């Protein structure tokens, strides 16, 4: 009963709350800083009782910049990202994976069209704090419905660089967060973004993607979630033969991906149901001798809703 009263109080508060111009201005400052500034730093990802530490280095330039992300815990791996190419170096397997995807990662989490976020989030200024030895200003994005998570961002008061990002559930409790523990903003040597390993003799695996229309194969993939619109529809090469179809929906901040893969030739068993990792919820179904996997940084009910909307109709 107490939880219900808190939820009703939150809904009532959001109904009266309004996005403020000051909050939108801070979002624009954060977005500009993550795109235009060069920096290097160490951040910690936390969800539940698990943590991962990474080092990120970015050089901003007229070509769109270059960025290197290094895992400092567990299995060694490096990711080097340019404007349109992502290379993942796996030294233990001597493999380089090449992709053309452009997924946003911390600290560059915000979309270009910030004003559209106010349709689905109440955006307000939060309290000042201190992160990585720097004074930071916070902005809170609380969802106007239960279909998406809340977000709290804290940025360097001077430069606008995002220092901390937290995802919140519908009770305002943390699901996961990214936090810089050390960061240097300013000129960065280009040597800092070069791969650590000489990978000229390594095996290169390209994840080729081509535009696709799933309806032409009989698949109906749609989303009735307010604000989530289709932003990607492609087919990707998978293993030596075969492929997987992918459709991505996004509200500008959160994204949900639908993957459709034939069961023919698949050796590992399919485990239908719901699973999750931090803020990521995953729903797996079998449909028409295919496995449908829906992965999204959204509440389980939202991901389930999109998964149940995937149907196959035999073409005449």
Where are these regions (language model features)?
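Positively charged n-region of N-terminal signal peptides that target proteins for export
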Residues: 1-4
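Hydrophobic h-region of N-terminal signal peptides that target proteins for export
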Residues: 8-17
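N-terminal mature ectodomain segment of secretory-pathway/periplasmic proteins
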Residues: 18-94, 119-168
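Acidic/charged, solvent-exposed loop-and-adjacent secondary-structure segments enriched in E/D, K/R, S/T
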Residues: 88-109
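Extended beta-strand-rich segments in extracellular/periplasmic secretory proteins, especially
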Residues: 111-168, 202-247
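Surface-exposed amphipathic alpha-helical segments
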Residues: 159-161, 168, 172-191, 293-316
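Short, gly/Ser/Thr-rich active-site loops of penicillin-recognizing serine hydrolases
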Residues: 186-213, 316
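Short, solvent-exposed recognition patches
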Residues: 201-288, 300-305
């Amino acid at each position: 009963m107490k939880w219900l009263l808190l939820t009703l109080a939150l809904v009532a508060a959001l109904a009266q709350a309004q996005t403020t111009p000051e909050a939108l201005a801070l979002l624009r400052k954060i977005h500009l800083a993550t795109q235009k500034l060069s920096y290097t730093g160490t951040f910690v990802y936390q969800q539940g009782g698990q943590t991962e530490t990474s080092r990120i280095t970015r050089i901003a330039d007229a070509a769109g910049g270059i960025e290197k992300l290094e895992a400092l815990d567990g299995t060694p791996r490096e990711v080097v990202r340019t404007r349109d190419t992502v290379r993942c170096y796996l030294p233990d397997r001597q493999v380089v994976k090449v992709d053309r995807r452009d997924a946003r990662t911390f600290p560059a989490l915000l979309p270009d069209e910030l004003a559209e976020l106010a349709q689905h989030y109440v955006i307000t200024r939060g309290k000042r704090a201190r992160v990585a030895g720097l004074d930071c200003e916070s902005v809170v994005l609380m969802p106007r419905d239960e279909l998406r998570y809340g977000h709290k961002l804290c940025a360097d008061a001077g430069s606008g660089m995002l220092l901390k990002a937290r995802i919140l559930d519908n009770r305002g409790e943390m699901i996961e967060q990214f936090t810089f523990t050390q960061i240097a903003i300013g000129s960065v040597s280009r040597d800092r973004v070069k791969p650590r390993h000489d990978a000229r003799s390594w095996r290169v695996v390209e994840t080729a993607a081509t535009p696709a229309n799933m309806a032409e194969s009989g698949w109906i993939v749609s989303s009735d979630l307010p604000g989530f619109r289709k932003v990607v529809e492609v087919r990707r090469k998978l293993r030596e033969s075969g492929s997987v179809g992918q459709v991505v929906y996004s509200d500008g901040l959160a994204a949900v991906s639908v993957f459709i893969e034939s069961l023919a030739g698949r050796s590992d068993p399919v485990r239908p149901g719901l699973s999750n990792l931090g803020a990521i919820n995953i729903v797996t179904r079998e449909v028409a001798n295919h496995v449908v996997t829906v992965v999204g940084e959204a509440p389980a009910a939202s991901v389930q809703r999109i998964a149940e909307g995937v149907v196959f109709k035999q073409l005449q």
